[in-house]
Amino acid sequence: PEIRFEGFTDAWEQRKLGDVLERRIEQRQQSEEYPRLAFASGQGVIPLSERKTNNREQLTKDEYTKKYLVTELNDIVYNPANVKYGAIDRNKCGRGLISPIYVTFTTNEIPGFIERIVTSHDFQQRALRFEEGTVTKRQSVNPEDLVTLDILVAPKREEQQKIATYFDNIDHLITLHQRKCEE
């Protein structure tokens, strides 16, 4: 990168996304320890109660016996059918269960740093070259393809954390200014 934080000079490493992510495949039934969550483009992982409803719950049979996908705080979650709409984000909500139509990954790097990579326009555009499906509106990006994408990774976790914190602070400032404008 052209701009670096002071004290970091090591070259970034080109790696496959699959080198820094591991798919989480555990499923469970809904419980107090594992509440239902939702995943929405532009919002990320949110409590199910905050999702704008379109009566999807009536489509779910046996709500309390159905198994859902486990997600934990800082997992990377994406919707294979909606990458084109930015449906990839970090779980900032916490432990819970989401629909098994989504894909969840854990990471061995700083989650906020990996979030910035996978939510970037450039990354999402590169992911779209893997879209498959016979109907354009129903195309999806398989997780097996997504993890083959090359990414650049800061070799030191301290630098990753500084980058993640920097962008989190910018996001926070934007949110504050948006609220101020709405008043």
Model-predicted segments: where are they?
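Proline-centric
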Residues: 6-11, 103-113, 129, 144-159
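Histone-fold recognition with a strong bias for associated Lys/Arg-rich disordered tails
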Residues: 1-2, 145-148, 162, 183
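A short beta-sheet element
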Residues: 60-124, 131, 137, 142
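Extracellular/lumenal glycan-associated surfaces
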Residues: 1, 76, 161-173, 177-178
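Extended intrinsically disordered, low-complexity coil regions enriched in Ser, Thr, Gly, Ala
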Residues: 13-14, 174-183
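Non-catalytic DNA-recognition/assembly elements of restriction-modification systems
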Residues: 4-29
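DNA target-recognition patches
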Residues: 28-61
